[in-house]
Amino acid sequence: MRNSLLISLAAAALAEGKAYSPPAYPAPWASGAGEWAQAHDRAVEFVSQLTLAEKINLTTGVGWEGGQCVGNTGSIPRLGFRSLCMQDSPLGVRDTDYNTAFPAGVNVAATWDLDLAYRRGVAMAEEHRGKGVDVQLGPVAGPLGRAPEGGRNWEGFAPDPVLTGQMMASTIEGMQDTGVIACAKHYIGNEQEHFRQGSQENYTVADAISSNIDDVTLHELYLWPFADAVRAGVGSVMCSYNQLNNSYSCGNSYSLNHILKGELDFQGFVMTDWGAQHSGVGDALAGADMDMPGDVAFDSGTAFWGTNLTIAVLNGTVPEWRIDDMAVRIMSAFYKVGRDRTQVPINFASWTLDTYGNEYYYAGEGYKEINQHVDVRGDHAKVVREIGSASIVLLKNVDGALPLTGSERFVAVFGEDAGSNPDGVNGCSDRNCDNGTLAMGWGSGTANFPYLVTPEQAIQAEVLKNGGIFTAITDSGATNTTATTVAAQASACLVFANADSGEGYITVDGNVGDLVLHTVGPVLVEDWVNHPNITAVLWAGLPGEQSGNSLVDVLYGSVNPGGKTPFTWGKQRSDWGTDIIYEPNNGDGAPQQDFTEGIFIDYRHFDKYNITPTYEFGYGLSYSTFSFSNLQVTPLAASPYKPATGHSGPAPVLGKVLNATAYLFPNYIKRIEAFIYPWLNSTDLRTSSGDPNYGWSTSKYVPDGAQDGSPQPVNPAGGAPGGNPALYDPVAEIRVTVKNTGKVAGVEVPQLYVSLGGPSDAPKVLRGFGRLSLGAGEEAQWTATLTRRDVSNWDTVSQNWVVSNYTKTVYVGNSSRNLPLQQTLALKIGH
């Protein structure tokens, strides 16, 4: 009765469009759906051999600095199974050497090139694989980019679910085709850094920020790219630090059990972000499968899981089938990508670059060779350079100021952003400074530079090759008089600025010049971008180690710029309509971030309120020109959409749990300080737990249905990884002719937008894109396919996707504001 009432109340709240996460239990167990079947069967066979302690070792990290990687599970020596290695980052192998520093995700999005995204995924995975990494902690779809101030937006792709989703899928496919497990992160609503873990700086709050997101916005915006990741077969998903609707993401049963594992039929494992776990039993029942890094607080030696998870299974609080499912999900991902074939020993250490050191870094034990300095770079500099040049966006080019001809006699470069970091290329830990040119952001999503070709170095080399002379003023303290004198003498001036500094240099007078921006996202340029002395503006983003070479390729015309901005550039800060929280807004309780803008972020907001941007989403110039013509929209017959039906089988139980004596700490193992183990210290479970509340009735903290392993109904919106298979039925084919009307070969990015037509819908949303290379005068036909999902809305009442009766319109062009072709879409979808 109580359970039925709760379900009814939850359904009512969702139907009313409230930001609410109702409880959803039990955690769905993996079935081996779709392409997971063979890997799942192998995982079941493997897990069936394990003891309870060995299963716990798979699910629990050994603690911060308890192994050579940033995250390490326990091992299973009896079966020759070593610890699994989790390692950052989304743009290369973090905390090592002889690795490549790849362009950031935002640059990949600016290419609008799925092949480049795939190739970058392959190259990054080759390097992680070569270092012995099992799980690369990327790519990123959270943050999506709700507000331009989001500190980690650059790690992801774009504030658009389709562009991000397709980039996610291609990156994941590249990584996993190469034999490394990808990790889609940070799930979900992780849209700011302030208060993501609660208290910070001068503010004390009880809990992490809550992202309060209604059901429509969650499905149509923030969940969309994660669905693409699941459909692409991603092996792991990382739950985030923040709360979703006032429930911690790693313990939110609605987002993990109901949506991710139910609706999206995710077959892999959910990994916590480092320190994002807030309970033991609760998170296990809510759908978390692996705890990282394993300890409650770094180097504390205490754990929510480990011994405590062993106890919870022994006393029946966590059912046997749940721990079995956790282990099966982890091993399914392992086998799916072929780690049993591609795994090599871990040959680096995250905590030091010294050749010899302690394997157990915090404990200071296990002295051995920990860094073999394996060079994993191969020829990856080529793809770095290619992505760097392909992602450059030409924002302004007056009277053909670019490309440079190479005949300029005197080229001058201005700005700290053009030069080297005086403290060395890796002089700041995790790149946590802004000295010299900006080629990646900072934080855990970084990698060490093996070198960094600065713009100053690359431009000087080009100028000298052409017989010119060159000077660079990269000291931000240089006098304006000095800069003015040099500028007046130069044939061409190139001014460099980044997101943090450098705008003062654009006031240099006496010569026309070009401006290059290295930024993590949009910046306000309206005050100066139309200055007559600024003849060209390039956005180069965060291009990685080949920064200068990629830029020179475009500056001198060996590469015709084809990048399109993956975000909108507003004229003033208020244009975006969203912001992050800088100060607590809920007393000492969890800060509350209400996503009241709904689906209207970035260009959707600008369009809804008729705000004119400086540069719109999808905008980018070329050294050539292009035309669009002959739009053809062909509806395709599609069967009626049928909600998924039926039931799962019962939760499988693999092996047999013995009594507590079987799980006592082995006397042949030496304890390592602060290392997290699965074993008991006593056969008395209360004593072994050390928990003063041990023995409470499960009714006090175990939700209704959480322990139920009986057959469960299939989620009607589910049925296969990524959601109901009918969502991906093609419903229309779009064809358009694109012609290069200029005098040089170039690249154009056709973009397909759709208006869903409803009063609550955005004026238009991106639904497809391509990248065409065309010679001068050449034309080609570009084709795109719309799926049922592309023309559907999330219905909160039926809790499923529906195609509305509103008139739908197709638009094609080369930016969100330049769409010369449009046509009404007459669907042939059965009912």
Locations of the language-model features?
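Glycoside hydrolase catalytic-domain context in secreted enzymes
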Residues: 14-704, 708, 715, 721-793, ...
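Fungal secretory targeting signals
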Residues: 1-18
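Short beta-strand elements
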Residues: 818-831
